[in-house]
Amino acid sequence: MAILRPSVVSPTRPTVKTEVVYARGMESIVLFGPPGAGKGTQAQRIMDSTGLPQVSTGDMLRAAVSAGTTTGIEAKKYMDAGQLVPDQVIIDLIKDRIKEPDAKNGVMFDGFPRTVPQAEALADITTVSHVISIEVPDERIVDRICGRYTCAGCGAVYHESFKPTSKDGICDSCGGDEFKRRADDNAETVMSRLEAYHNQTSPLADWYESKGIFHVINGDRAIDLITNDILDALK
């Protein structure tokens, strides 16, 4: 079982449970979430609370290619040809990663698996004890992403509704007055990405739900409340 260690209570903010200690041997977590759901923020908090390292297959692929490992050389052939890297290559990378000392109690997978066959292959090499799905209504995702803009000078990130500049048109960090938006931060592109995400993850969610380890977390709330629900699910 997992032992939860609470943090000091804050008089103005929800109590954030700060540490989950695993006592069950090597078990891993899978983290789902559409773009704009705040998955990156929660991933960092899960790592801080559980001690499990985050495993991103994209990062692992790039590192393996850069290092010129056997698996990296194999992956590069497909990447250079503009093809998807086969599942077995990804699984080989994961096998190597979970042998590292920091993964002795498990890892947190981010961005993998994406398909049921990948989930089945993953189950052959590590025990997935919890699957966390951070869910936010599509219209809220569109608002979050399309309202983002950054300072052209220092890269500080703002949002029209949630985090505007203190002084209209002036960056709080550097005082610059030029801002930019990502070209793909528009409603049409975001909705297309969300549709692809839902189509991809729906069968996978059903598969994990059938295992009794799938946890839906309401991501349309305060960050601390989301974190607490995730850590409760990991007990």
Give the role of each language-model region.
Residues M1-K235:
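Glycine-rich phosphate-binding loop of ATP-dependent small-molecule kinases
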